Amino acid sequence: MAGPARADALKDEIAPTGKLRVAIAISPAGGAFWSTRTEAGGYAGVPVDLGREMAAQLGVGVEYVAHQNSGQIVDAAAKGSWDITFLPKDPERETKMLFGPIYEVADATYIVKAGSTATDFQTLDQPGVKVAAVNNTTTMRGAIAHLKNAKVTGYQTYDEIFGLLNNGEVDAFALSRDQLNAMARKIPGTRVLGETFKQTVTAVAVPLNHPLALAFATAFMTEAISNGTLRKAYDNNGLKDTPIRAKTQ
């Protein structure tokens, strides 16, 4: 298959509705994976910019399909409600979708509430300590594996956990360091612990049995990392000081 026939086959597979449906997850802080709602009623974020650029290359329109967290995006993978996404990858998710290149490596750690006496992982991991995580995410699974005594509870949204931490109803929140640093600036007295319990890798992904879509997404992301498209998306979304980390250490 070559030329126009291959291009048509790709569009049929990657954008069956005539638009590229990009699955995104919403949080107030944004970041390399999370997107935000704009005052005008649209969306902003690194995945938003990458999805728009990808649709332009395909010559189709773009439509964003908003979710509360990455676990919901994974659950929707088999339902045919989205065509492309950018989300944290782990072995469990690799059974439910096809992943292309990694474009972000994030360090997962914990933020502790104002007044907490925990200074490191050892003093945090005590019986009776309540740790929140976003439900059904790679970070939540990592925190459950990491903490032997503290109890990890999953919540649907970042907003809900923000409120619980702000009110002192949970002792800590597991998430990526860049997100937690942003949260610490908004909740006086909270602290982000210095250690890292897991490196979370974020990558482009397509539903299972979409080989043409995966090949296109892989080529697109490889080029985006090398030609400045990804850097521009970071810079446009408040991540000017964040280096591109496309490989684990």
Regions found by a protein language model. Name each.
Residues A7-P88, N227:
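Extracytoplasmic small-molecule ligand-binding "clamshell" domains
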Residues A9, T138-T153, V192-L193, T222-Q249:
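Ligand-binding clefts/hinges and TM-proximal coupling segments of bilobed small-molecule sensing domains
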Residues K19-I26, G41-A44, Q122-T137, K151:
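Short loop->beta-strand "edge-of-pocket" segments that line small-molecule binding or catalytic clefts
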Residues L20-R21, G59-G61, A78-L87, G128-K130, ...:
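Alpha-to-beta junction loops
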Residues V48, E63-D75, T119, T153-N167, ...:
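Short helix-initiation/N-cap motifs at beta->coil->alpha
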Residues R52, A56, G61-D125, R191-G194:
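Acidic, polar ligand-binding/catalytic clefts
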Residues G71, P88-K96, G142, N166-K198:
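A ligand-binding cleft/hinge motif common to bilobed small-molecule-binding domains
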Residues V105-A114, R177, N181-T222, K240-Q249:
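Periplasmic-binding protein-like
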